[in-house]
Amino acid sequence: MARTKGHIERPSNKSAKAVKNVAFKAAKKMLSKDSTKKKRAHPGAVALTEIKVLQRSTELLLRKAPFQALVREIAQVSKSDLRFQSAAISALQEAAEAYLVGLFEDTNLCAIHAKRITIMPKDMQLARRIRGERT
């Protein structure tokens, strides 16, 4: 059998150009989206705005279900089968959050006094010692 040259059909120039053009436009759109980057905030600016928002708000910072589970777990140590009113759990949560916020404020002051902006465990220990809570 003699060899014959097989005829391979190639796409016409028009359709190839159309496909290429569509791909080019899509790539151009993707690049234009990436090239318009938002301006980055200065380091610490986002944290400061977060702090301001949280200081203005009055809602609780700790989630209710995990806090309630923690209270029940701690109460289980002293006496089993204790029941809590929801108002009692809410009062405990308010008091706990007020204590923690105050402690973190004092801890931050200790860090600032040491010419740092990052709080460390030694700052918290010092704050508790100054308060007279150290055991």
From Swiss-Prot:
Gene Ontology molecular function terms on file: DNA binding; protein heterodimerization activity; structural constituent of chromatin
Residue ranges of the TM segments: none
Keyword field contains Protein transport: no
Entry keywords, A to Z: Chromosome, DNA-binding, Nucleosome core, Nucleus
Origin superkingdom: Eukaryota
InterPro entries cross-referenced by the UniProt entry: Histone-fold, Histone_H2A/H2B/H3, Histone_H3/CENP-A
Main location: nucleus
Compartments in which it is found: Nucleus; Chromosome
Pfam family, one: Histone
GO CC annotations, alphabetized: nucleosome; nucleus
Family under the similarity heading: Belongs to the histone H3 family.
Quaternary data: The nucleosome is a histone octamer containing two molecules each of H2A, H2B, H3 and H4 assembled in one H3-H4 heterotetramer and two H2A-H2B heterodimers. The octamer wraps approximately 147 bp of DNA.
Described purpose of this protein according to its UniProt entry: Core component of nucleosome. Nucleosomes wrap and compact DNA into chromatin, limiting DNA accessibility to the cellular machineries which require DNA as a template. Histones thereby play a central role in transcription regulation, DNA repair, DNA replication and chromosomal stability. DNA accessibility is regulated via a complex set of post-translational modifications of histones, also called histone code, and nucleosome remodeling.
Protein name: Histone H3
Species of origin: Entamoeba histolytica (strain ATCC 30459 / HM-1:IMSS / ABRM)
